Amino acid sequence: MTQESQAPSVRPEEGWHVLHLYYQIDHAQWSTLSRDEQLEAKTNLTELIQEIRSFPETQLLTFAVTTPKADIGFMLLTPDLIAATHFEKRLTLSLGADVLAPTYSYLSQTERSEYTTTREQYAAETLVAEKGLKEGAEEYEAALTEFDERMEKYTQHRLYPVLPAWPVVCFYPMSKRRGGSHEYNWYGTEYDDRRQLMKGHATTGRKYSGKILQLISGSTGLDEHEWGVTLLAHDTYQIKAIVYEMRFDDVSARYGEFGDFYIGLQLPLDELFRRICL
């Protein structure tokens, strides 16, 4: 039994904690290590990554960051905040004291969408109002069954995602405006209006199915912004395209506030070490 499993746990009622970690490498400190010490340090990080990935219900993405904002990044998903914190400390020290200098971090949780269409809404708005189907009809019931299956899969991805090893990883935090010097206040807007705005946003997102995998994690009360957005893609063109197109949706144009964007490249560990000059 590992140290993490013996410790008390802090787990949300549903979903996982998500921790984004970004570091710069102190190459001056790294250069003070002998060749054998450097090899030992890289072996230590490699073994730690393997250990974390073998931990129950846990995923760890590793990537080289493409700008001087950072050199290396990690995205950790795990239910237990105590385990996440322990892994974070070990990752920070994995190459030796003071080699990895934290430059940015973000804590959030996977969560359901507040604006997901319910079974009742789908039946009334789509099956009856739009398609003219009658409750109890064979086509009506088949459509409801298909909707239930689709929403179960969607909710599973929101709460317990399986993230692929697609090469491009984009992360940015965001919040919704709440008035002040702005005309628009998301939190003063009626729910039905907010739902319609988010429905339009979702329509834009579906155009990128198979090109972009998006994970929205909530961070109200946990970190500086209200959500963390992680995008996985095969190239940066699709990242740029979806972010640009969504900026024209009213929900972003009127209410969106965004933090810095971080772009990383998921690579095999040997290539990752070469990419960050270790």
Regions found by a protein language model. Give the residues of each.
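Short amphipathic alpha-helical segments
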Residues: 34-55, 92, 186-211, 247
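Surface-exposed interaction/gating patches
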Residues: 130-215
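Short, glycine- and small/hydrophobic-rich beta-strand elements in well-ordered beta-sheets
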Residues: 49-70, 98-112, 200-225, 242, ...
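An N-terminus-focused feature that recognizes amino-terminal "leader" regions
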Residues: 1-64
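Short loop/turn segments at strand-loop or loop-helix junctions that form parts
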Residues: 20-28, 171-177, 266
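Hydrophobic, ordered structural segments
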Residues: 26, 62-164, 234, 265-268
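Short, well-ordered beta-strand segments in beta-rich or mixed alpha/beta enzyme
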Residues: 21, 66-80, 119, 170-174, ...
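Activation on folded, globular domain regions of eukaryotic proteins
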Residues: 19, 35-44, 244, 250, ...
